[in-house]
């Protein structure tokens, strides 16, 4: 199910595999890769993950999550990590990905645009959605990314 990830690097960053998560249907969780984002000298500067497949839960949670540590923000590292993950998703046969963020999270919205996503909608979360129930969130920006023609590091 899981593939080799050694190719997930470019001149600026590399993704170091930290953990693999199997699917958990009872919790509506998909199989996932979890990575540390490292800069060109190997210093950890953040993290990201790729959740495989498509479902209602992933429509709202997204296929990719990312976080860049404060001192390293503003350099497009999250967008560059997303672009590397696009190739891994393609190798899993995925033709598109969804990335979501809160409507007031302007840095994340800019990351989605930088990585080539198109805003599909600002969706209201279903009443029973975990992000609504547990975190009090009500809406998500839904960005769609076509994987046709995407190559690692592009």
Where are these regions (language model features)?
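Conserved catalytic-core motifs of GNAT/GCN5-like acyltransferases
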Residues: 100, 118-135
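Conserved active-site alpha-helix within GNAT-family acetyltransferase domains
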Residues: 104-121
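Conserved acetyl-CoA binding element of GNAT-fold acetyltransferases
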Residues: 59-70
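Short hydrophobic/aromatic beta-strand or adjacent loop that forms the aromatic wall/cage
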Residues: 32-34, 136-143
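Conserved acetyl-CoA-binding loop-helix of GNAT-fold acetyltransferases
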Residues: 68, 74-88, 110-114
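Acetyl-CoA-dependent GNAT
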Residues: 2-59
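Conserved G/P- and acidic residue-centered "switch" motifs that form tight phosphate/ATP-binding loops
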Residues: 76, 93, 105
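Conserved GNAT acetyl-CoA-binding A-motif
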Residues: 89-100
């Amino acid at each position: 199910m899981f593939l080799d990830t050694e190719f997930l690097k470019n001149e600026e960053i590399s993704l170091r595999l930290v953990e693999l998560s199997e699917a958990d249907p009872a919790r509506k969780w998909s199989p996932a890769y979890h990575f540390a984002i490292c800069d060109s000298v190997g210093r950890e500067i953040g993290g990201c993950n790729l959740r495989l497949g498509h479902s209602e839960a992933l429509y709202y949670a997204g296929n990719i999550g990312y976080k860049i540590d404060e001192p390293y923000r503003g350099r497009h590292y999250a967008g560059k990590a997303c672009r590397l993950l696009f190739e891994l998703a393609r190798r899993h046969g995925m033709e598109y990905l969804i990335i979501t963020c809160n409507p007031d999270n302007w840095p994340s919205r800019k990351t989605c645009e930088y990585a080539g996503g198109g805003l599909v909608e600002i969706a209201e979360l279903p009443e029973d959605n975990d992000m609504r129930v547990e975190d009090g969130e009500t809406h998500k920006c839904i960005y769609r990314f076509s994987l046709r023609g995407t190559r690692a590091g592009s």
